[in-house]
Amino acid sequence: DVAPSRGLGDVYKRQTVSSGRFFPVQGNHDACSGPYSARLWPEAIGFLDAEQGVCRPAQKPYYYVDIAKEKVRLVFLCSYFYEHRGGEPVMIFGYEEDQIQWLQNEVLVLPADWTVMLFSHDAPFSALLFDEKTALEKNDIVNGNQIFSALDQCRKQYGFDIAGWFIGHYHGDRIVTLFGIPFIITASETAYDPQLFDDDVRFWERDLDTQSEDLWDALVLKKSERRVYLKRFGAGEDRIVHY
């Protein structure tokens, strides 16, 4: 999460210089309610329109990128949208219907030998850490069941693989598999105080001026093994995802 400001686009442009290619997704603190919020994020990621291979609907906060040689599609979803209430846009935790149609009718129309990896800040299920029945029946994410249903239907119809849905928001590490799809939660908490959260995720102690000050993963997809290797730099441990 990065609280939005009119200078956020400049921050992201500098990030692309240091990392080569940079594909952000909107977090809940990037999507705070207010008179300008609905347009701040699309403006901030406007630099993506000049990136080769990025397919983004005009002024939308979601997009995809192909690694065509490897037959891999990276899908970057937005788990927040806005509704006008009282004359101002209000942030909604969920997936707007236009995004679901875009996902179902364009993004997930793929040959069977392709592999899809999805990225979003929040998951499609608010009860992600529970069983499949609870995830569907106790879901507070607006259109969460619908976007997952679109994904599941396309997977069955076209036969492509889903290597994982990568999310943040929970502040800790955890891998959950629901309906045959791995959901990979990556830690981001800067202070070791798990009592702040009731979720069953792993938090890591972090200290300034030590290796644990860092916390990020290098991701390696091995299609032949049907595995994703996550190499942790800084606080935490390496992980392996089977799909």
Tell where the protein language model's regions lie, with residue ranges.
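Extended active-site neighborhood of metal-dependent phosphoesterases/phosphodiesterases
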Residues: 5-105, 110, 153-161, 172, ...
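Active-site glycine-centered loops adjacent to acidic/histidine catalytic or metal-binding residues
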Residues: 27-28, 121, 168-169
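Short acidic, glycine-rich surface-loop motifs adjacent to enzyme active sites
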Residues: 107-129
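Catalytic pocket-lining loop regions of alpha/beta-barrel enzymes
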Residues: 125-165, 183
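Short, solvent-exposed aromatic-acidic interface loops
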Residues: 231-242
